[in-house]
Amino acid sequence: MTAPTPENGCNKLQNMLQAAVQSVQWTYSLFWQICPQQLILVWGDGYYNGAIKTRKTVQPMEVSAEEASLQRSQQLRELYESLSAGETNPPTRRPCASLSPEDLTESEWFYLMCVSFSFPPGVGLPGKAYARRQHVWLTGANEVDSKTFSRAILAKSANIQTVVCIPVLDGVVEIGTTDKIQEDLNFIKHVRSFFIDHHSLPPKPALSEHSTSNPTYSTDHIPAIMYTVADPASTAIPNQDDMDEDEEEDDEDDEVESGSEDETNQGHNQHATSIIEAAEPSELMQIEMPDDIRIGSPNDGSNNLDSDFHLLAVSNQGNPSRQIDSYTTERWGPIEEPLDDSLQIQLSSSVLHHPLEDLTQEDTHYSQTVTTILQNQWIDSPSINYINYSTQSSFTTWTNHHFHPPPPPDPATSQWLVKYILFTVPYLHTKNHDETSPQTRDTAGVNSNDPSARLRGKGTPQDELSANHVLAERRRREKLNERFIILRSLVPFVTKMDKASILGDTIEYLKQLRRKIQDLETRNRQMESEKSGVTVLVGPTEKKKVRIVEGNGTGGGVRAKAVEVVASVQVSIIESDALLEIECLQREGLLLDVMMMLRELRIEVIGVQSSLNNGVFVAELRAKVKENGNGKKVSIVEVKRALNQIIPHNNI
């Protein structure tokens, strides 16, 4: 019986993942399978069932939700492969319906980044579930640290709150959602039922290099990426003593493919191997990041996806037939080879083991994966200049390409500078004199082609005339503004600060001053007439009568004769400011009655000047006009009518 093809295996696995995640309405489902060469859990297949930001399709008709999710899962995988392959291969033209990184939601980014992770048995949620052969349920995945969940930073960004890893016969099924769900054993049984009847134990890899009958991987699901072992000694396996000979022969084959290692790197490898055997493997990729883009802790909520990193150009030495996107659990060692003139980093194919820290390696893996994904996008941008730096030093090797000696001076330039100085310096102190000289103005048009005139900035007579007009107009406006400022300071009653209001208030103030002058002159004449005992008419326009002091013939006293005074009311309202002038016969409590009447009219008095002379009451009131309940203000006619009702109009 023939084994199933890889396409059938992938479709079968994806159908099971699709059925499982859609039955529980979670966000995504993944299958982690054992890599037969490295004996670690790697990404086998997945199905995305979450929110979609931008749909890109070439199909003319609408598709169902299931077909859209299936197509989205395939597009996400194609996007990751195209971006990862762009690290070493030149980018190829992609179809117009292909996704771009800016088309993804945060949950799609989480699904895409999961492809780059790998888990040794006992490490991470999938590794623990596989090693213990029991499920692992994590609630609040976006709130824990990287020790508990190595993808905590991604989960925090995508708001993935619940992650469940369920071991099956030949791998681990991971399913996640953006909702916070508590552990449920019936849920575990339900999801496991989709896989328990379809998978069988994969055949064991042949331990003898002479056997070719056994396949190297399970035929039920084919890994999408071939994985290579950078150093077999770094992988802890139970039958280490039984497979020493096989590993030595495999090492010889690897040396033929990848080339001989440097002696210095071999020494580091031997020392690092003894350290790494006692430590727990981590999840790292083959790109080392500079210190300025390492992510300190997932708890701070930092997200450096949009930062402009300095990218490292990794050159894989060895057989080109090897897959470029292979994964290892090792870190790059120090660079021993010197930098060449073009500052390109030449990395040795050998890698070194280092002791593991608590959080550095998980965060480094996250930063490295983001850089690998986005590197192809940044390379396409013409506005970014890349310089390759060493990860071990902040300095670069000096080369003569960076030093450009200054070019020898051009004799023509020196001559031009000398001429410019000779023509310009003599006219610096005589510039004002030349501009005001009539002779210069007359000859400016004739000598317009003179180079000295051009150097002095001379123009045509029309230009000079226009410039003079502009300067004159500017000075006139400045003087006018200064005078308005002085006028505003002289007028005590200014309603607004614009020029028209200042002029209007000034005119009104002058009228008031004129009336006061007339009143004072009238009083002076009245006082003089009282002294002489002669009746004096004030004037034809005033229509006033004053008290005349007459002496009787017997000299028994002075009798005051009261005459009638015509009442006068003047009201001026400008917006909310009001000025009221009242002149009438004196009455007890008249000023109080006037102020109460103004209060009823929603007029607030802010200043009062009043006087009483020979029974004549004169008052000047300044007030603010307020709006009534209807939003309207009282008019001048209404104020006059109200005041005329309370002031006396004839002699009592």
UniProtKB/Swiss-Prot annotation:
Which UniProt keywords are present, listed alphabetically? Activator, Flavonoid biosynthesis, Nucleus, Transcription, Transcription regulation
Q: Cite the GO molecular-function annotations of the record.
A: protein dimerization activity
State where composition is biased (Polar residues).
Answer: 437-451
Q: Name one GO cellular component term.
A: nucleus
Q: Which InterPro entries match?
A: bHLH-TF_ACT-like_plant (IPR054502), bHLH_dom (IPR011598), HLH_DNA-bd_sf (IPR036638), MYC/MYB_N (IPR025610)
Q: Where is this region: Disordered?
A: 233-271, 431-463
Intracellular or extracellular location(s):
Nucleus
Q: Where is the composition biased (Acidic residues)?
A: 241-264
Q: Which residue ranges traverse the bilayer?
A: none
Q: Write out the similarity annotation.
A: Belongs to the bHLH protein family.
The record describes the protein's role as: Transcription activator involved in the control of flavonoid pigmentation.
Task: State the remark under miscellaneous.
Answer: Corresponds to one of the seven genes studied by Gregor Mendel in 1866. The white flowered cv. Cameor (a allele) has a truncated non-functional BHLH protein (AC E3SXU5) due to a point mutation resulting in a mis-spliced transcript.
What name appears for this protein in its UniProt entry? Basic helix-loop-helix protein A
